[in-house]
């Protein structure tokens, strides 16, 4: 991948670079994904998650920008793995962009084949929100991480992480949410990363409190704050596959253990034991096969240490990066003895159609987001947990790129909120349209047996019809852009998932599209979990009037 040193920043204000606000939204969100405040390696088009890109290469990026600038409001741009391949006449209620990223026929759905295609310039890895142009920086995963640690606290620590120590690793675009999520729940956390730049970035954006290169200092500070029952987050420079076994050797057992290193990609995401970043980069280039093998061996040691800590009483869970699968394939037969975070903590929310709903102010004016915060606090005042989240986010979350907000809303709530936002744009309360979207990690848009659909009640973990149906219904209902990806979060061969974005531009047509899309999208989550036999999903469907032909 050619590196290009240029600063990309989404336009602000109400002046259009395109022929309509939906096209403008797509353009601004693509550019926002590559804003240096947002992207991990913008010079390589990498947004987050190892090699999760916004476009296949710089030529494709420019072609997408040019296409969006000339796209009519009754046309649809097709993007294949980060390359614009066609513009067809459609209609005004159709999506302006349809994206398919990283999708491979199952027999060939592995990293080796993907890399062959990538080398030939035929494919890119879109992760989840990188290639679908709706990444908002670390805030995008923050509430989900906060909810996960909050539920762990409710289940195991009397509702708070006060006086507890969490040990984790990985402070990239996704994992970087962990330190703040733990301290928001009152706990102490040591978060390990091998890349000083990642730790520095989290400290700069106030997601992490302090930096150290010393395990001794990290433990001393952690114990001091744990005793005081005060929260602190400590970014520790080092390799988790070395530090965790060392802690096991010393008989030091944290209260909570997880991991968000980029283990989903053994070549580009994980650094083997004994290598600096520079040495790893050289080996990756010179001998990728040896690199991958060393990486897998290190991951196995990492998981062995997590299992040892679990045996000693630590609440241990996988945070969706497929590290257990790698260790299992390397011969560690009890790698799956600790659960994934979705079955352990999140699935009840999915049954209610809840998930990581987000919105972005295209104006670039933070006041537009603060006004929408007030809407949440007013309209959902009976949901104390949600309102607490909004208040904390306002105080503690620094915007990256265009101002944005995330909160978990369920079936019915999303459509209600979308209607209000569109009205606020229409009457001028908000200074420009709002983009409404979500992560692909949602209640009804993913098939990922080692993450979102792990341990489904009926054994349907690997059934991949659901994300396809999700993308289809969102497209026909008028989402502004819709994406279908493969391999996000857990790597090639392990997931299929769909994303959607809808623009609230204040028009009556947008109001109708918002009503349809923000009903069917979370509705798919309720339907998927009803089909799998979850009582809470059945209750939700009956209470909310979701029409499911064979529901009992």
UniProtKB/Swiss-Prot annotation:
Disulfide bonds: none
Protein name stated in the entry: Urocanate hydratase
InterPro entries per UniProt: Urocanase, Urocanase-like, Urocanase_C, Urocanase_central_sf, Urocanase_CS, Urocanase_N, Urocanase_Rossmann-like, Urocanase_sf
Lineage, top ranks: Bacteria, Bacillati, Bacillota, Bacilli, Bacillales
Keywords in alphabetical order: Cytoplasm, Histidine metabolism, Lyase, NAD
Enzyme Commission (EC) number: 4.2.1.49
The gene coding this protein: hutU
Catalysed conversion reaction: 4-imidazolone-5-propanoate = trans-urocanate + H2O
GO MF annotations, alphabetized: urocanate hydratase activity
Primary location class: cytoplasm
SUPFAM superfamilies to which the protein is assigned, alphabetical: Urocanase
Cofactor note: Binds 1 NAD(+) per subunit.
Location(s) in or outside the cell: Cytoplasm
Family: Belongs to the urocanase family.
Residues at which NAD(+) binds: 49-50, 127, 173-175, 193, 239-240, 260-264, 270-271, 319, 489
Pathway terms, separated by semicolons: Amino-acid degradation; L-histidine degradation into L-glutamate; N-formimidoyl-L-glutamate from L-histidine: step 2/3
Cofactor(s) the record lists: NAD(+)
Entry's Gene Ontology BP terms: L-histidine catabolic process to glutamate and formamide; L-histidine catabolic process to glutamate and formate
């Amino acid at each position: 991948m050619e590196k290009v040193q240029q600063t990309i920043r989404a336009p602000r204000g109400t002046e259009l670079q395109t022929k309509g606000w939906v096209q403008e939204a797509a353009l601004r969100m693509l550019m926002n994904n590559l804003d240096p405040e947002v992207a991990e390696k913008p010079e390589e088009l990498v947004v987050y998650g190892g090699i999760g890109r916004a476009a296949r290469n710089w030529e494709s990026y420019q072609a997408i920008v040019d296409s969006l600038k000339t796209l009519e409001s009754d046309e649809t741009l097709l993007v294949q793995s980060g390359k614009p391949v066609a513009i067809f006449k459609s209609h005004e209620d159709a999506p302006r962009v349809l994206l398919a990223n990283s999708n491979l026929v199952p027999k060939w759905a592995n990293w080796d084949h993907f890399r062959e295609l990538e080398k030939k310039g035929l494919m890119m890895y879109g992760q989840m929100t990188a290639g679908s142009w709706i990444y908002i920086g670390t805030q995008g995963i923050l509430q989900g991480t906060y909810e996960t640690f909050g539920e762990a606290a409710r289940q195991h620590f009397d509702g708070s992480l006060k006086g507890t120590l969490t040990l984790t690793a990985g402070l990239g675009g996704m994992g970087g949410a962990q330190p703040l999520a733990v301290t928001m729940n009152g706990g102490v956390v040591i978060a390990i990363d091998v890349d000083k730049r990642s730790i520095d970035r989290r400290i700069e954006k106030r997601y992490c409190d302090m930096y150290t290169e010393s395990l001794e200092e990290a433990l001393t500070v952690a114990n001091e704050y744990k005793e005081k029952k005060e929260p602190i987050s400590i970014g520790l420079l080092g390799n988790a596959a070395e530090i965790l076994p060392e802690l096991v050797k010393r008989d030091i057992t944290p209260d909570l253990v997880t991991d968000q290193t980029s283990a989903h990609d053994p070549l580009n995401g994980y650094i083997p034991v004994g290598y600096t970043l520079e040495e790893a980069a050289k080996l990756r280039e010179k001998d990728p096969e040896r690199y991958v093998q060393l990486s897998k061996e290190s991951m196995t040691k990492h998981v062995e240490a997590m299992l040892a800590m679990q045996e000693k009483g630590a609440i241990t869970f996988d945070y969706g990066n497929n590290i257990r699968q790698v260790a299992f394939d390397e011969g560690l037969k009890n790698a799956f003895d600790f659960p994934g975070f979705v079955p352990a903590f999140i699935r009840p929310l999915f049954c209610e159609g809840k998930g990581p709903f987000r919105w972005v102010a295209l104006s670039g004016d933070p006041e537009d987001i603060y006004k929408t915060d007030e809407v949440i606090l007013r309209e959902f005042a009976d949901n104390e947990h949600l309102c607490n989240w909004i208040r904390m986010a306002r105080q503690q979350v620094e915007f990256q790129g265009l101002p944005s907000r995330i909160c978990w809303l369920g079936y019915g709530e999303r459509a209600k909120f979308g209607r209000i936002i569109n009205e606020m744009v229409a009457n001028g309360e908000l200074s420009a349209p709002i983009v409404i979207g979500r992560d692909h990690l949602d209640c009804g848009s993913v098939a990922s047996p080692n993450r979102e659909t792990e341990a489904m009640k009926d054994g349907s973990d690997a059934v991949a019809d659901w994300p396809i149906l999700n993308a289809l219904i969102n497209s026909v209902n008028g989402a502004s852009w819709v994406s279908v990806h493969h391999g996000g979060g857990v790597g090639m061969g392990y997931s299929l998932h769909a994303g959607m974005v809808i623009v609230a531009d204040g028009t009556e047509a947008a109001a109708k599209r918002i009503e349809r899309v923000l009903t069917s999208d979370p509705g798919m989550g309720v339907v998927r979990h009803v089909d799998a036999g979850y009582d809470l999903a059945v209750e939700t469907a009956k209470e909310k009037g979701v029409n499911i032909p064979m529901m009992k």
